[in-house]
């Protein structure tokens, strides 16, 4: 089941973002029955650009990721992974995006594990009931964790008009595979 929660936050100060994120988790309800110590949690962020920092509002803001890492590691005792495949099709873009957005520093400071989906093993997914896309690949980590927390960046998009939670999951498709399913 998919549950969505939204909370207003007027800036990216860590304390305010953490409060807003905790409010979202409380809106989901009974989070303690879903998340247990030792679970593997993937924060599926949105890294569209390897050249634009947090101030450009293109990628998931690093403070949001920091707040989530602190909550899932600190409050729930989970093993936290941070993963994506950058929107750019250039080799090395995802690693660069983790650096430019300072996600690599967050992982280093907190012990979270960065997963570059372009370098992750890929799993073949088949859905014979699908009308159009019956087969595609996703990063293995997406299926191997206990919980995937989708952390999109709501913004406009040239092909789909806007991008959000559903579109963000396209980043689970490694490397050039994304262009085939757009």
Task: Identify what each model region corresponds to.
Residues 1-182:
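N-terminal and secondary-structure boundary signal
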């Amino acid at each position: 089941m998919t549950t969505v929660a939204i909370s207003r936050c007027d800036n990216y100060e860590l304390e305010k973002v953490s409060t807003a994120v905790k409010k979202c988790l409380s809106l989901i309800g009974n989070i303690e029955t879903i998340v247990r110590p030792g679970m593997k949690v993937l924060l599926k962020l949105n890294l569209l650009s390897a050249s634009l920092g947090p101030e450009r509002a293109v990628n998931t803001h690093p403070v949001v990721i920091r707040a989530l890492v602190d909550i899932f590691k600190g409050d729930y005792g989970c093993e936290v992974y941070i993963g994506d495949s950058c929107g750019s099709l250039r080799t090395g873009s995802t690693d660069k995006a983790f650096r430019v957005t300072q996600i690599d520093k967050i992982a280093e400071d907190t012990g979270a594990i960065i997963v570059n989906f372009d370098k992750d093993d890929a799993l073949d997914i088949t859905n014979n009931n699908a009308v159009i896309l019956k087969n595609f690949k996703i990063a293995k980590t997406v299926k191997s964790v206990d919980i995937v927390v989708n952390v999109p960046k709501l913004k406009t998009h040239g092909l789909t008009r806007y991008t959000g939670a559903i579109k963000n999951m396209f980043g689970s498709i490694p490397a050039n595979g994304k262009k085939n399913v757009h």
